[in-house]
Amino acid sequence: EQIPFSVAVIDMDWHLVDIPPKYGTGWTGYTWNRELFPDPPEFLAWLHEQGMKVTLNVHPADGVRAHEEAYPRMAEALGIDPAGGTAAEFDVTDRAFLEAYFDVLHHPMEEDGVDFWWVDWQQGKKTRIPGLDPLWMLNHYHYLDSTRAGGAGLTFSRYAGIGSHRYP
């Protein structure tokens, strides 16, 4: 009681983790687990009423699979036929993917009350561009995106190597 919490950090169980095996693991996810969080906007509003900012953990490496609520919008944004169920593969080097990643997946949740993201990339340092670390790029783009409304940017992440400190 009377502990001065200022940020609610919600690990990966905010999203579905027990998914059909045909979609892979539940490590990556963008659909709220309604058993644990039946009304996400209400929960986020309550945390804000308690004076807390909110960050959600995200492991984006597996892209967006067909079981996700946002899959049809993500597929459409990337020119994928949603009826086929082909995953929207994560690709930090693809401008169209990055735009959809923020516009389709993250911004709607921010409108519901998520203040910033905990980028928890653990899937290696390779992209289609040799030498370009996906975590470093994710931190860069999350930081830039967090400034779009004119405020000071903020990214919560794993250490991405030299230069990571430039993204608070």
Task: Map each language-model feature to its residues.
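Catalytic-domain carbohydrate-binding cleft regions of carbohydrate-active enzymes
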Residues: E1-P168
